[in-house]
């Protein structure tokens, strides 16, 4: 400490470098606190920096947290991670930036921010305008029966937790969105899977489950189910509502994809056909509008509404007023309908482009059902393949896909991949199929 370094000239001659290089090195050493420069005197070795605090010992948390981990969401959350820039994404659940109506959203947000009183605390139930819009879309609820939430995920969590108690039985489709499984297991529920096909939930098998045990809640995606793209058939809709009435269970309708139609007539919401308050309805605008617009509605009738409102107050409190105002401004404008047409057209092009590429390059991969909406193809791998292994090797080859086993509530009935076309242009989807073919 305190030793004087040789002069710049000496260092230059000793190491055969330029004076500029020596100056850069000295400046870097000084920035790190290793040397001290004293003008007119020279450069000296600095005193050893004080030792920092000892590294934190976080091992105690393992004992405090216990052995339970949210395994059900681990692989699913990995799909939300940003891959390498050169990786083609065929695994996510949102539209890509090219399909976000940015200019219209900015205009709506600008108008919303200028409104008087918008920066105050919004009502717990949501603004009147937002509740009215979602009530009209639901087809079965009054605005007073609608609660606005910060996105669809929190709405689903509130509904499942509020309508059940730990230890209760809950019926989930299989395959289905793994977020339901994670919520149910986190709440200590007893999960009973019921298979689906292209016509939605197998109500004949649901009847067997409900006859054998008391369940409180059945969770369904009647329209463009994730991941299969199936639509609940008219006869099964009637049977589901009849089973709910006879067995006294709630039905949670996750209507996440109504604004992601590619073509053809859509059935009405299940809630619109429910007379006795069995259906609890969730509708989000995040997927069709933009990932940053985290806004959804949760609707119910009777005592269930009061239970949901109390749970929402604890878990979600109130939603940003400017966000609600901006969303309603956009959804009530001609820009929204133009955007829906654009999304429908582009999703159709992407779906068909990916299907053609799969049939050309991967004839052994079977897509049994071509969805009329949503963002995903449910593709069965040939016998002998492991979906998790294929997904891992595909990622190494530069294409990110989702292993089908992530989506099964029970044992997988085969090896599948969920291939997303909503977040990737056609040319990249074709290249993604080529990369996937290289690992099969």
Model region roles, listed by residue range:
Residues 36-38, 366-372:
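Short beta-strand
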Residues 279-360, 367-369:
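PLP-dependent aminotransferase class I/II
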Residues 172, 193, 251-253, 327, ...:
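Hydrophobic residues in well-ordered beta-strands that form the structural core
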Residues 406-412:
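AMP-binding (ANL) adenylation modules
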Residues 116-247, 259-276:
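Conserved core of the PLP fold type I
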Residues 1-110, 309, 313-319, 331, ...:
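N-terminal basic, amphipathic alpha-helical segments
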């Amino acid at each position: 400490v305190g030793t004087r370094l040789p002069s710049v000239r000496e260092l230059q001659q000793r190491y055969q470098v330029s004076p500029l290089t020596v100056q850069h090195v000295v400046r870097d050493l000084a920035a790190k606190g290793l040397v001290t420069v004293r003008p007119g005197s020279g450069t000296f070795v600095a005193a050893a920096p004080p030792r920092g605090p000892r590294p934190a010992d976080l091992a105690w948390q393992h004992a405090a947290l216990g052995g339970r981990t949210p395994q059900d969401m681990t692989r699913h959350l990995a799909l939300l991670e940003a891959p390498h820039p050169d990786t083609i994404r065929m695994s996510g659940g949102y539209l890509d930036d090219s399909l976000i109506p940015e200019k219209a959203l900015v205009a709506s947000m600008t108008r919303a921010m200028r409104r008087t009183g918008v920066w105050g605390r919004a009502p717990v139930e949501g603004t009147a305008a937002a509740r009215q819009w979602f009530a009209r879309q639901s087809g079965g609820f009054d605005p007073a029966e609608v609660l606005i939430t910060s996105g669809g995920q929190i709405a689903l969590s509130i509904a499942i937790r509020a309508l059940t108690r730990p230890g209760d039985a809950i019926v989930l489709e299989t395959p289905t969105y793994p977020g339901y499984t994670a919520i149910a297991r986190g709440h200590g529920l007893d999960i009973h899977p019921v298979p689906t096909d292209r016509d939605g939930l197998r109500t004949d098998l649901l009847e067997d489950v409900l006859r054998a045990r008391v369940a409180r809640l059945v969770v369904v995606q009647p329209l463009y189910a994730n991941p299969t793209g199936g639509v609940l058939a008219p006869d099964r809709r009637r049977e589901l509502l009849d089973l709910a009435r006879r067995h006294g269970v709630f039905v949670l309708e996750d209507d996440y994809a109504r604004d992601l139609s590619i073509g053809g007539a859509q059935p009405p919401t299940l809630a619109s056909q429910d007379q006795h308050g069995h259906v609890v309805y969730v509708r989000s605008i995040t997927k069709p509008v933009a990932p940053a617009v985290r806004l959804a509605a949760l609707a119910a009738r009777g005592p269930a509404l009061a239970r949901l409102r109390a749970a929402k107050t604890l878990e979600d409190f109130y939603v940003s007023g400017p966000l609600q105002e901006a969303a309603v401004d956009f959804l009530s404008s001609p820009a929204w309908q133009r955007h829906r047409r654009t999304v429908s057209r582009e999703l159709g092009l992407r779906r068909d482009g990916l299907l053609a590429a799969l049939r050309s390059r991967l004839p052994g991969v079977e897509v049994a059902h071509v969805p009329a909406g949503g963002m995903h193809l449910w593709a069965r791998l040939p016998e002998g393949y492991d979906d998790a292994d294929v997904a891992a090797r595909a990622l190494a080859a530069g294409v990110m896909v989702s292993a089908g086993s992530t989506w099964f509530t029970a044992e997988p009935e085969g090896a599948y991949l969920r291939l997303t076309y909503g977040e990737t242009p056609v040319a990249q989807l074709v290249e993604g199929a080529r990369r996937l073919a290289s690992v099969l």
